[in-house]
Amino acid sequence: MFNWVKTAMLMAAITALFIVIGGMIGGSRGMTIALLFALGMNFFSYWFSDKMVLRMYNAQEVDENTAPQFYRMVRELATRANLPMPRVYLINEDAPNAFATGRNPEHAAVAATTGILRVLSEREMRGVMAHELAHVKHRDILISTITATMAGAISAIANFAMFFGGRDENGRPVNPIAGIAVALLAPIAGALIQMAISRAREFEADRGGAQISGDPQALASALDKIHRYAAGIPFQAAEAHPATAQMMIMNPLHGGGLQNLFSTHPATEERIARLMEMARTGRFD
Protein backbone atom coordinates (compact mmCIF):
# COMPACT_ATOMS: atom_id res chain seq x y z
CA MET A 1 0.00 0.00 0.00
CA PHE A 2 2.82 2.41 0.89
CA ASN A 3 4.37 1.96 -2.57
CA TRP A 4 1.09 3.03 -4.16
CA VAL A 5 1.17 6.18 -2.01
CA LYS A 6 4.76 6.85 -3.09
CA THR A 7 3.81 6.32 -6.73
CA ALA A 8 0.88 8.75 -6.44
CA MET A 9 3.07 11.35 -4.74
CA LEU A 10 5.73 10.93 -7.42
CA MET A 11 3.21 11.40 -10.22
CA ALA A 12 1.77 14.47 -8.47
CA ALA A 13 5.21 16.04 -8.00
CA ILE A 14 6.23 15.51 -11.60
CA THR A 15 2.84 16.73 -12.84
CA ALA A 16 3.39 19.93 -10.84
CA LEU A 17 6.76 20.38 -12.57
CA PHE A 18 5.09 19.99 -15.96
CA ILE A 19 2.52 22.65 -15.03
CA VAL A 20 5.20 25.11 -13.90
CA ILE A 21 7.15 24.64 -17.12
CA GLY A 22 3.93 24.94 -19.14
CA GLY A 23 3.15 28.21 -17.39
CA MET A 24 6.59 29.58 -18.28
CA ILE A 25 6.17 28.61 -21.92
CA GLY A 26 2.56 29.64 -22.50
CA GLY A 27 0.94 31.21 -19.45
CA SER A 28 -2.38 29.78 -18.27
CA ARG A 29 -2.98 28.11 -21.62
CA GLY A 30 0.43 26.50 -21.38
CA MET A 31 -0.39 25.26 -17.89
CA THR A 32 -3.59 23.63 -19.16
CA ILE A 33 -1.75 21.97 -22.03
CA ALA A 34 1.01 20.84 -19.66
CA LEU A 35 -1.55 19.33 -17.28
CA LEU A 36 -3.18 17.37 -20.09
CA PHE A 37 0.25 16.29 -21.34
CA ALA A 38 1.28 15.18 -17.84
CA LEU A 39 -1.90 13.15 -17.39
CA GLY A 40 -1.24 11.48 -20.73
CA MET A 41 2.37 10.79 -19.75
CA ASN A 42 1.27 9.29 -16.43
CA PHE A 43 -1.08 6.93 -18.27
CA PHE A 44 1.59 6.05 -20.82
CA SER A 45 4.24 5.54 -18.12
CA TYR A 46 2.06 3.14 -16.16
CA TRP A 47 1.18 0.92 -19.10
CA PHE A 48 4.05 1.21 -21.58
CA SER A 49 7.21 2.68 -20.04
CA ASP A 50 8.76 -0.75 -19.39
CA LYS A 51 8.47 -1.63 -23.08
CA MET A 52 9.95 1.73 -24.03
CA VAL A 53 12.94 1.30 -21.70
CA LEU A 54 13.66 -2.20 -23.00
CA ARG A 55 13.49 -0.85 -26.54
CA MET A 56 15.89 1.99 -25.67
CA TYR A 57 18.46 -0.62 -24.67
CA ASN A 58 17.68 -2.92 -27.60
CA ALA A 59 17.10 -5.68 -25.05
CA GLN A 60 16.46 -9.13 -26.49
CA GLU A 61 14.18 -11.55 -24.66
CA VAL A 62 15.75 -14.94 -23.90
CA ASP A 63 14.43 -18.24 -22.63
CA GLU A 64 15.64 -21.62 -21.44
CA ASN A 65 16.80 -22.50 -24.94
CA THR A 66 18.67 -19.30 -25.83
CA ALA A 67 20.27 -18.56 -22.42
CA PRO A 68 19.71 -21.70 -20.33
CA GLN A 69 22.05 -21.04 -17.38
CA PHE A 70 21.00 -17.42 -16.92
CA TYR A 71 17.29 -18.19 -17.35
CA ARG A 72 17.38 -21.08 -14.86
CA MET A 73 19.19 -18.87 -12.35
CA VAL A 74 16.45 -16.24 -12.53
CA ARG A 75 13.75 -18.91 -12.25
CA GLU A 76 15.36 -20.46 -9.17
CA LEU A 77 15.70 -17.07 -7.46
CA ALA A 78 12.14 -16.08 -8.38
CA THR A 79 10.93 -19.30 -6.76
CA ARG A 80 12.95 -18.55 -3.61
CA ALA A 81 11.43 -15.06 -3.52
CA ASN A 82 7.91 -16.45 -4.08
CA LEU A 83 7.54 -14.32 -7.23
CA PRO A 84 6.04 -15.07 -10.65
CA MET A 85 8.68 -15.80 -13.27
CA PRO A 86 9.63 -12.46 -14.90
CA ARG A 87 10.51 -12.04 -18.55
CA VAL A 88 14.28 -12.24 -19.01
CA TYR A 89 16.32 -10.03 -21.35
CA LEU A 90 19.93 -9.64 -22.46
CA ILE A 91 21.49 -6.37 -23.63
CA ASN A 92 24.47 -6.57 -25.97
CA GLU A 93 26.73 -4.15 -24.08
CA ASP A 94 30.23 -4.64 -22.68
CA ALA A 95 29.53 -2.46 -19.63
CA PRO A 96 28.50 -4.68 -16.69
CA ASN A 97 25.04 -3.73 -15.41
CA ALA A 98 21.49 -4.97 -14.83
CA PHE A 99 18.01 -3.64 -14.07
CA ALA A 100 14.40 -4.62 -13.48
CA THR A 101 11.30 -3.00 -14.94
CA GLY A 102 7.54 -3.48 -15.22
CA ARG A 103 4.40 -2.22 -13.50
CA ASN A 104 4.00 -5.06 -10.95
CA PRO A 105 5.41 -8.51 -10.12
CA GLU A 106 2.97 -10.14 -12.55
CA HIS A 107 4.27 -7.98 -15.41
CA ALA A 108 7.96 -7.73 -14.53
CA ALA A 109 11.13 -8.08 -16.56
CA VAL A 110 14.79 -8.35 -15.60
CA ALA A 111 17.62 -7.44 -17.94
CA ALA A 112 21.39 -7.88 -17.80
CA THR A 113 24.18 -6.88 -20.14
CA THR A 114 26.34 -9.47 -21.85
CA GLY A 115 29.25 -7.71 -20.17
CA ILE A 116 28.05 -8.50 -16.66
CA LEU A 117 27.68 -12.18 -17.52
CA ARG A 118 31.30 -12.24 -18.68
CA VAL A 119 32.70 -10.32 -15.70
CA LEU A 120 30.92 -11.97 -12.76
CA SER A 121 31.09 -15.48 -11.40
CA GLU A 122 27.88 -17.50 -11.19
CA ARG A 123 27.71 -16.85 -7.44
CA GLU A 124 28.10 -13.09 -7.93
CA MET A 125 25.55 -13.11 -10.73
CA ARG A 126 23.04 -14.77 -8.41
CA GLY A 127 23.57 -11.91 -5.99
CA VAL A 128 22.88 -9.34 -8.71
CA MET A 129 19.73 -10.99 -9.98
CA ALA A 130 18.47 -11.48 -6.42
CA HIS A 131 18.91 -7.70 -5.98
CA GLU A 132 16.82 -7.06 -9.10
CA LEU A 133 14.12 -9.47 -7.95
CA ALA A 134 14.07 -7.65 -4.60
CA HIS A 135 13.12 -4.52 -6.56
CA VAL A 136 10.28 -6.53 -8.11
CA LYS A 137 9.19 -7.91 -4.73
CA HIS A 138 9.22 -4.43 -3.16
CA ARG A 139 7.27 -3.09 -6.16
CA ASP A 140 9.97 -0.52 -6.83
CA ILE A 141 9.96 -1.23 -10.54
CA LEU A 142 6.87 0.86 -11.36
CA ILE A 143 8.26 3.86 -9.47
CA SER A 144 11.68 3.66 -11.12
CA THR A 145 10.29 3.18 -14.62
CA ILE A 146 7.80 6.05 -14.28
CA THR A 147 10.52 8.30 -12.86
CA ALA A 148 12.85 7.53 -15.75
CA THR A 149 10.19 8.24 -18.37
CA MET A 150 8.91 11.44 -16.78
CA ALA A 151 12.37 12.83 -16.00
CA GLY A 152 13.32 12.45 -19.65
CA ALA A 153 10.16 14.28 -20.70
CA ILE A 154 10.83 17.10 -18.22
CA SER A 155 14.32 17.62 -19.62
CA ALA A 156 12.98 17.73 -23.18
CA ILE A 157 10.29 20.29 -22.33
CA ALA A 158 12.74 22.40 -20.32
CA ASN A 159 15.10 22.50 -23.30
CA PHE A 160 12.17 23.60 -25.46
CA ALA A 161 11.51 26.45 -23.02
CA MET A 162 15.12 27.61 -23.19
CA PHE A 163 15.51 27.55 -26.97
CA PHE A 164 12.06 28.70 -28.04
CA GLY A 165 11.08 30.91 -25.11
CA GLY A 166 7.46 31.32 -24.13
CA ARG A 167 4.48 33.64 -23.99
CA ASP A 168 2.00 34.54 -21.29
CA GLU A 169 -1.78 34.25 -21.60
CA ASN A 170 -1.89 37.61 -23.44
CA GLY A 171 0.62 36.49 -26.04
CA ARG A 172 3.48 38.62 -24.70
CA PRO A 173 6.96 37.04 -24.56
CA VAL A 174 7.99 35.99 -21.07
CA ASN A 175 11.22 37.11 -19.46
CA PRO A 176 13.95 35.14 -21.30
CA ILE A 177 15.95 34.87 -18.08
CA ALA A 178 12.98 33.15 -16.44
CA GLY A 179 12.84 30.72 -19.36
CA ILE A 180 16.52 29.91 -18.96
CA ALA A 181 16.04 29.48 -15.20
CA VAL A 182 13.24 26.98 -15.80
CA ALA A 183 15.36 25.14 -18.35
CA LEU A 184 18.17 24.83 -15.81
CA LEU A 185 16.17 24.19 -12.64
CA ALA A 186 13.47 21.81 -13.91
CA PRO A 187 15.89 18.96 -14.74
CA ILE A 188 17.61 19.50 -11.38
CA ALA A 189 14.24 19.26 -9.62
CA GLY A 190 13.53 16.07 -11.54
CA ALA A 191 16.95 14.71 -10.55
CA LEU A 192 16.29 15.53 -6.90
CA ILE A 193 13.03 13.58 -7.03
CA GLN A 194 14.86 10.64 -8.59
CA MET A 195 17.68 10.84 -6.06
CA ALA A 196 15.39 11.01 -3.03
CA ILE A 197 13.50 7.91 -4.14
CA SER A 198 16.32 5.87 -5.61
CA ARG A 199 19.08 5.92 -2.97
CA ALA A 200 16.97 4.46 -0.16
CA ARG A 201 15.49 1.97 -2.62
CA GLU A 202 18.93 0.63 -3.56
CA PHE A 203 19.84 -0.09 0.06
CA GLU A 204 16.54 -1.92 0.53
CA ALA A 205 17.08 -3.96 -2.64
CA ASP A 206 20.59 -4.89 -1.47
CA ARG A 207 19.12 -6.12 1.81
CA GLY A 208 16.23 -7.90 0.10
CA GLY A 209 18.53 -9.45 -2.49
CA ALA A 210 20.83 -10.75 0.23
CA GLN A 211 17.81 -12.38 1.89
CA ILE A 212 16.63 -13.96 -1.36
CA SER A 213 20.03 -15.41 -2.28
CA GLY A 214 21.11 -16.06 1.31
CA ASP A 215 24.56 -14.77 0.31
CA PRO A 216 25.18 -11.06 1.02
CA GLN A 217 28.92 -11.49 0.45
CA ALA A 218 28.28 -12.53 -3.17
CA LEU A 219 26.41 -9.29 -3.88
CA ALA A 220 29.12 -7.28 -2.12
CA SER A 221 31.76 -8.91 -4.32
CA ALA A 222 29.63 -8.30 -7.42
CA LEU A 223 29.17 -4.60 -6.61
CA ASP A 224 32.91 -4.16 -6.08
CA LYS A 225 33.69 -5.85 -9.39
CA ILE A 226 30.99 -3.96 -11.34
CA HIS A 227 32.21 -0.67 -9.87
CA ARG A 228 35.80 -1.31 -10.95
CA TYR A 229 34.96 -2.60 -14.44
CA ALA A 230 32.23 -0.06 -15.21
CA ALA A 231 34.57 2.86 -14.52
CA GLY A 232 36.53 2.03 -17.66
CA ILE A 233 33.75 0.81 -19.97
CA PRO A 234 31.21 3.34 -21.29
CA PHE A 235 27.58 2.22 -21.40
CA GLN A 236 26.51 3.85 -24.65
CA ALA A 237 22.76 3.27 -24.33
CA ALA A 238 22.69 4.64 -20.78
CA GLU A 239 24.71 7.71 -21.78
CA ALA A 240 22.14 8.33 -24.53
CA HIS A 241 19.24 7.97 -22.06
CA PRO A 242 20.59 9.31 -18.72
CA ALA A 243 17.13 9.49 -17.10
CA THR A 244 17.13 5.68 -17.01
CA ALA A 245 20.41 5.46 -15.06
CA GLN A 246 18.61 5.17 -11.71
CA MET A 247 17.12 1.84 -12.80
CA MET A 248 20.55 0.16 -12.93
CA ILE A 249 22.21 -1.76 -10.12
CA MET A 250 25.22 0.55 -10.55
CA ASN A 251 25.25 4.13 -11.85
CA PRO A 252 26.28 3.70 -15.52
CA LEU A 253 27.03 7.36 -16.22
CA HIS A 254 30.56 8.72 -16.42
CA GLY A 255 31.33 12.24 -15.27
CA GLY A 256 31.72 14.43 -12.23
CA GLY A 257 30.40 17.67 -10.81
CA LEU A 258 26.61 17.88 -10.71
CA GLN A 259 26.31 14.37 -12.11
CA ASN A 260 27.98 12.95 -9.00
CA LEU A 261 26.17 15.39 -6.70
CA PHE A 262 22.79 14.21 -8.00
CA SER A 263 23.73 10.55 -8.32
CA THR A 264 20.71 8.30 -7.86
CA HIS A 265 22.86 5.56 -6.30
CA PRO A 266 24.44 5.51 -2.84
CA ALA A 267 28.21 5.16 -2.57
CA THR A 268 29.35 1.68 -3.57
CA GLU A 269 31.65 1.51 -0.54
CA GLU A 270 28.71 2.06 1.81
CA ARG A 271 26.60 -0.56 0.06
CA ILE A 272 29.44 -3.09 0.32
CA ALA A 273 30.03 -2.27 4.00
CA ARG A 274 26.36 -2.87 4.83
CA LEU A 275 26.34 -6.18 2.97
CA MET A 276 29.53 -7.37 4.66
CA GLU A 277 27.98 -6.53 8.03
CA MET A 278 24.99 -8.70 7.09
CA ALA A 279 27.39 -11.51 6.15
CA ARG A 280 29.23 -11.13 9.46
CA THR A 281 26.15 -11.05 11.70
CA GLY A 282 23.73 -13.14 9.67
CA ARG A 283 21.09 -10.45 10.24
CA PHE A 284 19.21 -8.71 7.43
CA ASP A 285 17.32 -6.04 9.41
Swiss-Prot record:
Q: Which InterPro entries does the UniProt entry name for this protein? A: HtpX_protease, Pept_M48_protease_HtpX, Peptidase_M48
Alphabetic keyword roster:
Cell inner membrane, Cell membrane, Hydrolase, Membrane, Metal-binding, Metalloprotease, Protease, Transmembrane, Transmembrane helix, Zinc
Q: How does the protein associate with the membrane?
A: Multi-pass membrane protein
The UniProt entry, under Gene3D superfamilies, shows: Metalloproteases ('zincins'), catalytic domain
Gene Ontology biological-process annotations:
proteolysis
The taxonomy runs: Bacteria, Pseudomonadati, Pseudomonadota, Betaproteobacteria, Burkholderiales
GO MF annotation, one = metalloendopeptidase activity
Kindly identify the residues recorded as the active site: 132
> Cell cycle: is it a keyword of this entry?
no
Enzyme class, top EC level, equals: hydrolase
Q: Please state the Enzyme Commission number of this protein.
A: 3.4.24.-
Cofactor details (free text): Binds 1 zinc ion per subunit.
Q: What is its main location?
A: membrane
**Gene name per UniProt:** htpX
The record lists Zn(2+) as bound by 131, 135, 202
Which family does the UniProt entry place this protein in? Belongs to the peptidase M48B family.
What does the record give as cofactor?
Zn(2+)
Give one Pfam family. Answer: Peptidase_M48
* Localization (cell): Cell inner membrane
Q: Name one GO cellular component term.
A: plasma membrane
Instruction: Report what the protein is called.
Output: Protease HtpX homolog
The organism encoding this protein is: Burkholderia multivorans (strain ATCC 17616 / 249)
Entry superkingdom? Bacteria
Parts of the chain that traverse the membrane: 7-27, 30-50, 146-166, 177-197
